[in-house]
UniProtKB/Swiss-Prot annotation:
Keyword annotations from UniProtKB, A to Z: Collagen, Glycoprotein, Secreted, Signal
Gene it is expressed from: C1QTNF3
Name of the featured protein: Complement C1q tumor necrosis factor-related protein 3
Bridged cysteine pairs (disulfide): none
Single annotated GO MF: identical protein binding
Protein source organism: Homo sapiens (Human)
Collagen-like domain location: 51-113
Start-end of Pro residues biased regions: 55-64
Amino acid sequence: MLWRQLIYWQLLALFFLPFCLCQDEYMESPQTGGLPPDCSKCCHGDYSFRGYQGPPGPPGPPGIPGNHGNNGNNGATGHEGAKGEKGDKGDLGPRGERGQHGPKGEKGYPGIPPELQIAFMASLATHFSNQNSGIIFSSVETNIGNFFDVMTGRFGAPVSGVYFFTFSMMKHEDVEEVYVYLMHNGNTVFSMYSYEMKGKSDTSSNHAVLKLAKGDEVWLRMGNGALHGDHQRFSTFAGFLLFETK
């Protein structure tokens, strides 16, 4: 145990020895302010080069927010922007109030006249044998517009247009042949001819499409022979307007 205490006090004396030497040097030298020049020999090591700057330390914590600054001045007016796209259709608005009556309009142009209806059909209920004269029909079944004259057997065109005519005649058995002519204002358009020996009857027919002016007349004229007529109406004459013309 004794030798351990001896070693302890020797180490302690070696630790304080430089400090005591430095204090002696300091007390013997004049005081000129600051550390004595020779004290660095016992208290400090030799001077060396400055070391390199160490790396930056980690960022510190965020600071406390500052006070709200004053409002700045108004900026200059900006340029007009580009035209935007067309928006969606809006909802239907409420119904507006009824407006006032407008002024009376000008008189309009004449309208299209209604379509004129013209048609007739006549027949022979009795025999007819008056040669070279207009055929007078004893019965008129249809006379729309009343433009067929029952007394004269003639049709008068009320308007200019295109008309259709047809007739069918039965030869009387007492004659061999018969001629019938379709007349237009006194001119023969065409004729119908029927032939058969006596004692026998025969029926012939013909048709025409005529362009008539207003006031023109159309009728049938009897030539040679005789026509058969009874309640069965074998001999007929008919016509109607197809369409008007200017």
